[in-house]
Every structure is written in C-alpha cells, then in structure tokens.
Amino acid sequence: MSSELSMRIRALLLSNLMSELVRFGVSLEKPLLDRFDVLTRAKQYTNRSEALRDLIRMELVQQEWKSGSEVVGTITLIYDHHKRDVLIRVMDMQHDFQEAIICTQHIHLDHHNCLEIVAARGKAEEVQKLADALRSIKGVRHATLSMSSTGREIE
C-alpha cells in the first residue's frame, strides 16, 4: 500500500472518530481573558479551545457526580502499616465494598508508610461512601478522592 493511500485512510478514520467541531464566540472582560491566558500557558495548553474544553468537561464530570450517575474514581490513601490493625481494617473495608472496587495497588513508600490506590466504579454515592469509609479508618494519615467519569457522558 502506498504511503499516500495509507495517509488518506488514516485521515478518513480519524475524521470519522472525531466529533464535528463548532466554532462560537465568547465575550469576556479583558482582565478575565488575561488571567485565562496565563492559566492556559501555565497548564501548557496549546490554545484557548483546549483549555475551555477541559473546563467544560470538568463541570460535566461534577454534574455526573451530583446526578448519581455511574462514575469512576480513585481513592489514594497514605498510612503507616505498623499502626495496629490499620492494614486489616483497610482490607476489610475493601471487601465490604467489593462490588465498587475495580482494583487496588499497594506501594511501600518507606519502612513505615504505604500508599494504597483504589480504583472504584459505581453510583456516585457508593464511591463517595467508600472513600469516606477508608478515610475514617484510624491510622490513615491522608486520603483523597479523585472524581472522574466513565466517559460516556462527555465527548
């Protein structure tokens, strides 16, 4: 197959995969636009459109979480595995929420501290309950929930 034909086929496939782009105008106060441009550069976006798309997607993900849709998230825990029963309580809690947990990863940071990453999927309320339950375990030093989308509701 010639390279020109290969490039045409690739371009056709990519054009079918991408949504139709629509241009629209946005009116902003100059100081707000200046701050947005600083943010856009700081986050290394190639242009304002990419930055704006990400802001819209972040809002759509938040709406998914508020509406009770099926969502995904990662829960990151830091704990001292030498603390009495903390590892057992973390594992017990994971078993209690086994329907929501996709996978876990356990990393030894140093002699005392462990990093546990829990990937979860389910109704937003259930994933939030799992994060709260893990966060509340005595001996967990830090816990965060990173909320995301299954991708079905956002383009």
Show where each model-derived region lies.
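Short Lys/Arg-rich basic patches
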Residues: 4-27
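Short amphipathic alpha-helical segments
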Residues: 26-28, 36, 46-57
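Short, charge-rich, low-complexity interaction segments located
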Residues: 52, 61-68
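Short glycine-/aliphatic-rich beta-strand segments at the starts of folded cytosolic domains
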Residues: 69-81, 115-116
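Short amphipathic alpha-helix segments
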Residues: 80-101
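Helix N-cap motif at beta-to-alpha junctions
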Residues: 82-83, 120-127
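Short amphipathic alpha-helices in soluble, non-transmembrane regions
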Residues: 89-93, 129-136
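Conserved short beta-strand edge segments in small beta-sheet-based binding/regulatory domains
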Residues: 99-107, 132, 136-151
